[in-house]
Amino acid sequence: MIIAIDGTAASGKGTLGRTLAMRLGLDYLDTGLLYRAVGLAVKQADMDLETASDDTLKLLVESLDLSQNFGPELRSSEIGELASKVAAIPQIRASLLEKQRDFAQRPPHSKGAVLDGRDIGSVVLPDADAKFFIDAAADIRATRRHLELKARGEDIDFSDVLSAIIKR
């Protein structure tokens, strides 16, 4: 069984995805964290996205282990900004698309998978067994994200979070 959860930023995709996966005994993948993981790898390698070759970017994506537990550092606003830049690069999007589809078709620990993220139901897994689209008002989503960031110790103004949510 493959379940795809799409929706707007900070709308609750992850909460729903993790809960469904746990209750149904399926593997779970937050695809937004993949872009964040690439963003973190870019930062750690001190890589310039403007000058990096397609081969270098492809190797970077191929080195990601989807079964690992990604740490809280991926949820920082800095890595979120890098993830947005990374997501705009067609080579990275294509490579991650392959990884996401492979995870869904061959989940590492069960007979099914729940994937959440942007374009999951329309682009990544158009033939998923079940598809959901989650949305909430921008101020509600900004409040959720602001609380997440503050809980991680980030000192960020609510208006900045709201602006970022509206942009995305």
Question: PLM ranges: what are they?
Answer:
Residues I3-G7:
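Hydrophobic anchor at the beta1->P-loop junction of P-loop NTPases
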Residues A10:
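Walker A (P-loop) phosphate-binding loop of P-loop NTPases
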Residues G14:
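Walker A/P-loop
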Residues A21-T31, M47:
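Post-Walker A helix-loop "phosphate-sensing" segment adjacent to the P-loop in P-loop NTPases
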Residues L34-G112, S122-V124, D139-T143, L147-K167:
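ATP-dependent small-molecule kinase phosphotransfer cores
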Residues D129-F133:
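Short, well-ordered beta-strand core segments
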